[in-house]
Amino acid sequence: MYPTSGCARVLMACPAPAMLRGPLLRPSTTAIRGLRGSPLLYHYAATSNSNMRYFSSTSRRWIKEFFAPPKETDHIVESVTTWKHPVFTEKQMKEIAIAHREAKNWSDWVALGTVRFLRWATDLATGYRHAAPGKQGVEVPEQFQMTERKWVIRFIFLETVAGVPGMVGGMLRHLRSLRRMKRDNGWIETLLEEAYNERMHLLSFLKLAQPGWFMRLMVLGAQGVFFNGFFISYLISPRTCHRFVGYLEEEAVMTYTHAIKDLESGKLPNWANQPAPDIAVAYWQMPEGKRTILDLLYYIRADEAKHREVNHTLANLKQGVDPNPYAAKYDNPEAPHPTKSAEIVKPTGWERDEVI
């Protein structure tokens, strides 16, 4: 399916020239051992402003820089985000747990059934399988055992789709607010910030791999189908869509939990001591000594857990009436209430009578 020769081709990993097989490659040879021939080109960058090519099988004229600095700008150095990520503590991130909200009505069952079908299809497409709940000690068949390459393929594919719901919901609520000439009561900002956060997950993983044409084609098809499907569904039932995203984030928390366990148990040796990309360090404000791929997975899992809570909470509200509890000021700030931080996490969401 993939070409087998030609170092100038973007999709294949070819042996590096002899003059480069020395100390220059030492930081990354471990990270990419066994991954040659992958449609994803693994590379490791020690610093964001380094021009040194630690690993790449693509000739210089074919390399596509995903994080190129601004061009033809005399005064602008970089773009600064408006949405600063809240600081998560190590204790908060390690307390995140797998959880499931039981379906209570037909809307919940539609959302849950759709998520389970999509999970099955995605697992099939990415060659993923984990032990069933209650059977964590059972060894997964060899063909389904995850490697660094398989994990990053799965992460990239999932994150390209995960940023769609927040953008669609925010866009439709924005248009609704304009059309009805009424306030949105804080929903738009939270939904757009969620989409932005998911995109930052993707950009972080793109520092570990460069997708080939087949992955890009899969993403194009999945995004086209999912965007339009979610668009129509949100017009019909926003509540069902938020419940769907809540269940989807439950699966995301489960996926990242399994990845963390694999890494901590030594099943992913190439990531054992690999530093997190600079873009991730800056976005999550990672402290010194806590800037590895393992730490990155903990941060992303905490994000997904928060999205799980937010969407389950939004699904519990009256969609066209209630204000967004995550963008609200409360009469008693000392009482437990929804926040953007991970200080308080309710996996199954806040009930309406708890926040409104």
From Swiss-Prot:
Protein EC: 1.-.-.-
Regions crossing the membrane: 152-172, 217-237
Subcellular location: Mitochondrion inner membrane
GO molecular function terms attached to this record: alternative oxidase activity; metal ion binding
Keywords on record: Electron transport, Iron, Membrane, Metal-binding, Mitochondrion, Mitochondrion inner membrane, Oxidoreductase, Respiratory chain, Transit peptide, Transmembrane, Transmembrane helix, Transport
Gene Ontology CC annotations of this record: mitochondrial inner membrane
Binding site for Fe cation 2: 198, 249, 304, 307
Membrane protein topology class: Multi-pass membrane protein
Keyword DNA-binding: no
Ranges for region Disordered: 330-356
Cofactor-binding details, from the entry: Binds 2 iron ions per subunit.
Entry binding sites for Fe cation 1: 159, 198, 201, 304
Pfam families given in the database record: AOX
Necessary cofactors: Fe cation
One Gene Ontology term from the biological process aspect of the record: alternative respiration
Superkingdom as given in the UniProt entry: Eukaryota
Disulfide bonds: none
Presence of the UniProt keyword Transit peptide in the record: yes
Family, as annotated: Belongs to the alternative oxidase family.
Function recorded in the entry: Catalyzes cyanide-resistant oxygen consumption. May increase respiration when the cytochrome respiratory pathway is restricted, or in response to low temperatures.
Protein's recorded name: Alternative oxidase, mitochondrial
Organism (species): Ajellomyces capsulatus (Darling's disease fungus)
